[in-house]
Amino acid sequence: MTDRLTQLQICLDQMMEQFCGAVNYVDKNHGFEPSNDSEEQMSDPQAHIVEEKEFEKNIDELTTDIILKTRQIMALIDSLPGVDVSAQEQLHRIDSLQKQLIKMEKEKIDAIKRKDALQEKVRTLTQDFTIGINESKTEARLV
């Protein structure tokens, strides 16, 4: 899982792609409308003009996607630390987390020491067992 700032950057990149895609769609598929009543309606025989209903449906879908992405971005921004939190509260939280980290690091070191002691005990027992087997084989040959 990525951190919130990375998620926010990814969402902003995706939103920019959605904007570009929407503008490109409108540019490539719009109908030719005069800007005022005195202008003639222009046409381009090579243009791919989508039916108005389909065009409107696709525009609605594109805008819905952009709105959803905007909401996702807003939720990420709201979840960032520091929003509605004073600097003093943030420092207190950092101090608390540092103390927690130190405690957990000590627990980790203790666990590593216990593991090392157990490994040494197993090694010693294995060595003693191997020596015992070797000695019993030697005694059996002598008899």
From Swiss-Prot:
Residues 53-130 form a coiled coil. One of its GO terms (biological process) is regulation of transcription by RNA polymerase II. Keywords: Activator, Coiled coil, Nucleus, Transcription, Transcription regulation. The keyword Nucleus applies. One of its GO terms (molecular function) is transcription coregulator activity. It is found in: Nucleus. Its main location: nucleus. One of its GO terms (cellular component) is mediator complex. Belongs to the Mediator complex subunit 21 family. Component of the Mediator complex, a coactivator involved in the regulated transcription of nearly all RNA polymerase II-dependent genes. Mediator functions as a bridge to convey information from gene-specific regulatory proteins to the basal RNA polymerase II transcription machinery. Mediator is recruited to promoters by direct interactions with regulatory proteins and serves as a scaffold for the assembly of a functional preinitiation complex with RNA polymerase II and the general transcription factors. PANTHER family: MEDIATOR OF RNA POLYMERASE II TRANSCRIPTION SUBUNIT 21 (PTHR13381:SF0), RNA POLYMERASE II HOLOENZYME COMPONENT SRB7 (PTHR13381). Component of the Mediator complex. This is Mediator of RNA polymerase II transcription subunit 21. It comes from Kluyveromyces lactis (strain ATCC 8585 / CBS 2359 / DSM 70799 / NBRC 1267 / NRRL Y-1140 / WM37). The lineage of its organism: Eukaryota, Fungi, Dikarya, Ascomycota, Saccharomycotina.
